Amino acid sequence: MLPLYFGPPSRRLFGAFHEGSPGRAQSLGVLLCNPFGQEAIRTHRLYRVLAGRLAQAGVHVLRFDYFGTGDSAGEDDAADLESWRDDVLLAQRELQHLSGALEFTWMGARLGGAAVVRAAQQMPAAEPHLVLWDPVVNGPAYAQLLRAKHVEALEISYSLPDPAWRRQLQTEPASFRDEAIGIAVSPAMREQLAALREDQLDVPLASDAFVIADPANRAVQAWVAAQQARGARVESVGLPQALEWTSDDSLNAALVPAQAVQELLLAIDR
């Protein structure tokens, strides 16, 4: 694994490049795109496992942190979805430079899935294969989930939680918006989540997408059906066990479900 920084001086991004095993080198490069906040912390080990397995099979892999997240430059209140889209494109250029690969797969989990689709819309000629793990397709619903999970975390942190927190959550839409379990939510991110809808996430017809999601996630299933209806090459597979992405009970716990790893490896190799 090669740790590195890339990007312009004003926007340095941290990455980890896993070169494909020389004896099994392929022409495929894979970009792994993080989810948001605690979800990114919990999937960090899974991404390392994925990258290692793929590199052993000869695939070149780049993991990276968006600006304002992880080990990249910038504060966490500088992160927003539109800049994530630009960071995906910047990371793609770095992966192409490092690997010399001819074909590319972009994998994004949760909000990272939305960033991947938005990036693909800006680069249709690249025709990347997209792998979307439980993608966020409804911004307002996701923002509400973050607020609710933040209040849960506050309640767990205090031996005598304040009942007013729950009332605020239900009656004051502007409450608990600035932070999600220790991670700042920038004003730009809040605005972009409020505006994010399924019809803004059309998969380019030149690309294709494979979706791994909870079958009970109606928003994702409806989005998949809508994409198929417009002629996009989108397939989906469900996981029998729902994942708890953002939970203070599992704060800082690694999320490495064996079946998800296997499904992701199969989806990337399609």
In which residue ranges do the predicted regions lie?
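Gly/Ala-rich beta-loop-alpha elbow adjacent to hydrolase catalytic centers
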Residues: M107-V117, D134
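Short, surface-exposed "cap/lid" segments of acyl-processing enzymes
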Residues: G7-S10, E19-D65
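Short beta-to-alpha linker loops that shape the active-site pocket of alpha/beta-hydrolase fold enzymes
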Residues: F36, H60-G70, V136, P240-A242
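The alpha/beta-hydrolase serine catalytic core
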Residues: A125-A267
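Active-site signature of alpha/beta-hydrolase-fold catalytic machinery across serine-
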Residues: R118-Q122
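Terminal, non-globular segments
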Residues: Y5, G15-A16, A55, L62-R63, ...
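Short glycine-enriched, charge-decorated loop/helix-capping segments at active-site entrances
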Residues: L46-Y47, E75-D80, S250-A253
